[in-house]
Amino acid sequence: MQNLSTQDEWIARARAVFPAGGFGNFDPGIIIARGEGSHVWDENGTDYIDYLIGSGPMLLGHGHPEVIEAVLEQLPKGMTFFANNAKGIELAEAIVEAVPCCEQVRFVTSGGEADMYAIRLARAYTGRNKILKFEGGYHGMSAEAQMSLAPTTHVNFPQAVPDSAGIPPGVADQMLIAPFNDLAAVEMLLAENDDIAAIIAEPLQRIIPAAPGFLQGLRALCDRYSVLLIFDEIVTGFRLAYGGAQEHYGVTPDICTLGKIIGGGFPLAALGASAEIMRHFDKSIVGTDKWLMQLGTLSGNPIAAAAGLKTMEILRRDGSYSRLRETGRALQQMQSLALEGAGIAHQICGDETLFDVFFTTGPCRDYRSAKHDDPAR
């Protein structure tokens, strides 16, 4: 096959073999040729500052030499075994040491898979079926997760709205939807429904911050109504702090999911909880009826584990998170100055380590208020 060099030719080839022309729903309209540090280059050689960082995994930048060295050291020893391996065990130990709610973990390949198993685990542990999630919260591509992620029409809470074709109608009956940052709505739903297994939440929902006391309130309500609290830390884990949102906000869930950074740029995710909850993965303890089957071809593979271990080691070094926050503050200030100078109304929402710009004058407290953003900008 001819070695094509121009970006337009590569885009045409992509459109021929991929539905909608890309790997997923997100298509930036460029073809990335390589990355180094905080920059990526397209097939035409154009240099971009990469604020996407692979949607989160590349927090250290592209091609970090220590991560490359760790991967190259593991490669000749084996790439995957479908069995326990030393690197996977070491990574699990590092996660248990770092993340407050984790006494034990299970590895999977993607964050969406981790969230799917977290929901299933909550149901197995409690014997209940319903899940409360927040409108606009992203938890992967499972049927439950694709409820009220990005609804185009507003319906009355707590009605769930599917965001994708192919989801059986019965799934919505097992989901309750609440607005983010609304403890009163959550308490009302808990009081009116005795079949709720868990509340699943992003501690920082996309880039909408939790209002002061909201996460603490969720924890208290879950304790009062004997409902499990799941933190989806696929994005926030090892990013807001080394111990993730749990360390940063001082709130410990019952179950959490992790991904992105823990794989160091390779496919790897995990879910973790107390040993009491995680025992449902052990048939010898809970028996067949309460056992949760879970396995995956590449789960815990040593290449991803080696990359993740080295990434976590680097992040744990003194000054890593203070530098990350200083950089984030500087970027926020520069963005605000530029937009204010142009007379453009805006809000910078999120955390110093993870943020975005909304072109609106009102506060962003939940999905519906964020929708007031001007998409044309």
Model-based region annotation:
Residues 1-377:
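Conserved N-terminal phosphate-binding loop of PLP-dependent enzymes in the Aspartate aminotransferase
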